[in-house]
């Protein structure tokens, strides 16, 4: 664990002229990371599925909440969107493959969780025997509204899966160092 504490003991490296240390600490759990989202289809709910081309996203980043929970942004919501907090969806993982979704602002965006599950599979690399591939597949279906104004919105339904591959070097004992990011 890393602890950052203020103190007078820090000495500036005057040769390099650095006065601050910039750290990019990224917490992780077994489910956080970058997921392939191209198998997740986003439909407008007010049109028939066979009368429209579904929208997709290339990737979706899942961020840590706690050991068994992540959050991501609903549907086609951009991760740089100014009001992205409205579209935050939390995913909680149970031990038996059950995935439950919730949204902190579900009343505002009309979030409705329909179904969810997940599968974790592992296999060793054929060419590099020390390398383990862990695949996490999230299957889910939910509905939400994209707000245009206070009384105008577009109703969407997400249906499909997100998949993440994590490569783990089994010769390294520290979990955070063993993952090949």
Question: Positions of the model-derived regions?
Answer:
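Intrinsically disordered, low-complexity regulatory regions in eukaryotic proteins
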Residues: 3-181
């Amino acid at each position: 664990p890393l602890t950052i504490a203020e103190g007078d003991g820090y000495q500036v490296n005057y040769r390099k002229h650095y006065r601050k240390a910039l750290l990019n600490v990224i917490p992780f759990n077994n489910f956080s990371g970058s997921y392939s989202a191209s198998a997740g289809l986003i439909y407008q709910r007010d049109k028939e599925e066979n009368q429209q081309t579904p929208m997709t996203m290339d990737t979706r980043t899942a961020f840590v909440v706690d050991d068994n929970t992540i959050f991501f942004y609903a549907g086609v919501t951009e991760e740089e969107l100014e009001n992205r907090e409205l579209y935050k969806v939390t995913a909680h993982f149970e031990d038996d493959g059950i995935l439950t979704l919730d949204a902190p602002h579900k009343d505002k965006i009309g979030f409705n969780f329909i179904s969810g599950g997940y599968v974790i599979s592992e296999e060793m690399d054929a060419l590099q025997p020390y390398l383990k591939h862990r695949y996490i597949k999230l299957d889910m279906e939910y509905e939400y509204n994209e707000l245009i104004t206070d009384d105008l919105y577009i109703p969407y339904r997400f249906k499909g899966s997100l998949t993440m591959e994590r490569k783990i070097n089994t010769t390294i004992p520290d979990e955070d160092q063993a993952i090949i990011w």
